[in-house]
Amino acid sequence: MCVKKIRKASIWATGSYLPEKILSNSDLEQMVDTSDEWIVTRTGIKERRIAAPGEYASIMGAKAAEKAIEKAGLTKDQIECIIFSTSAPDYIFPSSAALAQAYLGIKEVPAFDCMAACTGYLYGLSVAKALVESGAYNNVLLIAADKLSSFVNYEDRNTCVLFGDGGSACVVGESRPGALEITNVNLGADGSVADLLSLPAGGSRLPASPETVAEGKHFIYMEGKEVFKHAVRRMESAAKICIAEAGLAEGDIDWLVPHQANERIIDAIAKRFEIDESKVFKTLSKYGNTAASSVCIALDELLQLHVINSGEYLLLVAFGGGLSWGAVVLRQVEG
């Protein structure tokens, strides 16, 4: 009898790209009615990176992808599919995936965007996992990048202190020694509360017009207190389900790699799962909220700074507009 091998998808390598320009809290003090103490106390953010002219989501993502492909030991010609998670695409169309493909010089493979706001990396990871495990593709390039500085109102102290720009990427393929196996994924969304976090204008519902520009409809809108409550509750629920479906106890998680939105949210999740502070990886103070790219940027930095031991489990959690949320459990494969 022929027994078909069950394919398991894993992250082979990661990469990240951060713009050079730093926007510090002291810089913001000169722009809006705020202070370093106010920002740090409420968010944990000290500075964030801002893309230069000519640095778009597609470019930042592609630069991160070059690092991930090299670390995976692949050539660009071996990439078979490109997924690009972003909420700040270069254009409505063509896709940022296609633009990144052209920048990278990857020829005529499928390339498409995935939009789930700050949860975009986890959504993209779920799609990449399915494509690899189904046998459709062997090597999938997942990019997550955002340039939210293009949509920030630097006269609104409640939102301008939060966001930064950046790009990230990972290569997903069949599980191999030394890789991070994508053990389980749990995702969710609730469009009935979509208005709590949005960028109202610029789409087909509110096309750009003098009125939408004058009314500030092209800037990020957020009801912070309500978003906070949803974020903690939804990420906790997704994480519990994901951990249980992986056949694990909550105490089995070795590292927490959360979406870098707000230190209070991160600390609340860590507390609920009793994860020691030393095992909660944060980049928030340096980069702020880099939206879809934040989890993968943090994961890439974690892998550069720490040795993940064989058999250790990582929990990724994220929350964003939609409202959308998700959790992913990764396991370090031996070797």
From Swiss-Prot:
Membrane-crossing segments per the record: none
Active-site residue list: C118, H259, N289
Pathway entry: Lipid metabolism; fatty acid biosynthesis
Catalytic activity, reaction form: malonyl-[ACP] + acetyl-CoA + H(+) = 3-oxobutanoyl-[ACP] + CO2 + CoA
One Gene Ontology biological process: fatty acid biosynthetic process
Subcellular location field: Cytoplasm
Regions annotated as coiled coil: none
Gene Ontology cellular component terms for the protein in this record: cytoplasm
Major site of localization recorded for this protein: cytoplasm
One Pfam family matching this protein: ACP_syn_III_C
GO molecular function, one term: beta-ketoacyl-acyl-carrier-protein synthase III activity
Keywords attached to this entry: Acyltransferase, Cytoplasm, Fatty acid biosynthesis, Fatty acid metabolism, Lipid biosynthesis, Lipid metabolism, Multifunctional enzyme, Transferase
Region spans: ACP-binding: 260-264
EC annotation from Swiss-Prot or TrEMBL: 2.3.1.180
The keyword Ribosomal protein belongs to this UniProt entry's keyword annotation: no
Annotated family: Belongs to the thiolase-like superfamily. FabH family.
Record text about domains: The last Arg residue of the ACP-binding site is essential for the weak association between ACP/AcpP and FabH.
Subunit structure: Homodimer.
Known function: Catalyzes the condensation reaction of fatty acid synthesis by the addition to an acyl acceptor of two carbons from malonyl-ACP. Catalyzes the first condensation reaction which initiates fatty acid synthesis and may therefore play a role in governing the total rate of fatty acid production. Possesses both acetoacetyl-ACP synthase and acetyl transacylase activities. Its substrate specificity determines the biosynthesis of branched-chain and/or straight-chain of fatty acids.
Descriptive protein name: Beta-ketoacyl-[acyl-carrier-protein] synthase III
The organism of origin for this protein: Chlamydia caviae (strain ATCC VR-813 / DSM 19441 / 03DC25 / GPIC)
Taxonomic placement: Bacteria, Pseudomonadati, Chlamydiota, Chlamydiia, Chlamydiales
